[in-house]
Amino acid sequence: MNLYLIRHGESQSNYDNKYNRAYYCGQLDVPLTEKGVESAKQLKPYFYNIKINDVYVSDLTRTKETYQYIFPYDIPTTVTSLLRERSLGLFEGQFKDKLMKNNMYHRYFHDPNYKDFRHSFIQKAPEGESYNDVYYRVKQ
């Protein structure tokens, strides 16, 4: 059995964080950009001669769009929230520069025990998930 893992194409959030004011996306439901659509379409030929038995995709728009551009034909597909990206809780949709100045969240950007929440396996944003939480969610 072969397992293929595909990340969604460039999302509007990816674009915004690169070229506009940066914010935390997490599980916000954002679409693909034109570049993201083109990236997904470029993967389509790779799978022409590969028999795909099942597809599992998160319920977020960016992942469903990526899937539709790669696999436009009928394949048994499971759409599930269990495959969503890590939740960033109260930080989702918030501008990073604004959060960094908010005294209520000071520790998440300045305290060594908390500030690694973006990369740590155990730390998390307030009301969000750690990577450990994601592991157990996906394992279901």
Regions found by a protein language model. Give the residues of each.
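Generic beta-structure capping elements
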Residues: I6-G9, L82
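Active-site-proximal alpha-helix that buttresses catalytic centers in soluble enzyme cores
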Residues: G9-T78
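Short beta->alpha linker loops
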Residues: S58-R62, L83, R137
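Phosphate-handling substructures
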Residues: F71-Y136
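Short amphipathic alpha-helical/adjacent loop interface patches that line ligand
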Residues: A40, V138-K139
